[in-house]
Amino acid sequence: MLGGVMSSGRAKPGTALAGVMWSIVIPVKRLSLAKTRLCAALAASTRDDLLTHSPPSAVRPAAEDQLPANGRIALAMAIDTVCAAQACASVACVVVVTDDRLAADTLSTLGARVVPDAPDDGLNAALRYGAGLAAAHRPDAGVVALSADLAALRPGELTDALEQAAGHARAFVSDAQGTGTTLLSALTGTDLDPRFGAESARVHRRSGAHPLEGGWPSLRRDLDTPADLTVAARLGLGRATAGQLALLAPDLVSCAC
């Protein structure tokens, strides 16, 4: 379990280790509580009638009938993130930590291993729990915490980052602003030690995690604001997120084309 024995050795800095496999841990909030600020900002700047009311049931699955717009966007982003991670040859499994039933049902059908947020004590506790389960399931694989809102994520960029991460006991990728963290990795036998929150890039670096260097625009672009969505749309949104935004904020997507 990753919360246990620490690695006695260090990977040679800057050296990508061939054949390293990874378990990806993705935390997903309860959909009704996710992306509320993003949706509020979109409502103020685009078509607030669609962002504050559910679209006709004919254009979405019946299970989503009562899900607010913010929840539909959050679920779509999680779907695209999971699909991108699963497309990487070095990813052994994807573990989703969530207490949301719809998210669990949807993401499990994509092949993710879904576990409840048993600690129920915030993001870092959920990630520690998921990392422990992932390590128990695949003790031969390193563990990666990955943001659930990387809707434009390209598998090639994630693969490249994971290859670099294989050269460091712990490593991280900062977000586009350079202050947050979108990816945190730990090799087998090393404590993941997630410290997400305010200024997490600085905090992770101070904790000993190595900052990974690479352009990786889709890996660094988590989606918290309409401006983030516009940039992600230019990069190319995943199918699920693009479909939701075509319904909820078509003007934003069309402006990015």
Each model region followed by its residue ranges:
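Conserved alpha/beta core of the MobA/IspD/sugar-nucleotide pyrophosphorylase nucleotidyltransferase superfamily
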Residues: 199, 203-257
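Conserved donor-nucleotide/metal-binding helix-loop-beta segment in metal-dependent transferases, i.e.
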Residues: 155-177
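Short, glycine-/small-residue-rich phosphate/pyrophosphate-handling segment
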Residues: 182-209
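A short, N-terminal amphipathic alpha-helix
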Residues: 72-91
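Acidic donor-binding segment of Leloir-type glycosyltransferases
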Residues: 91-113
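Short phosphate-binding loop-to-helix
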Residues: 106-142, 200-203
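Intrinsically disordered, low-complexity terminal tails and inter-domain linkers enriched
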Residues: 1-19, 43-69, 136-139
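N-terminal nucleotide-binding beta1-loop-alpha1 segment
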Residues: 8, 16-42
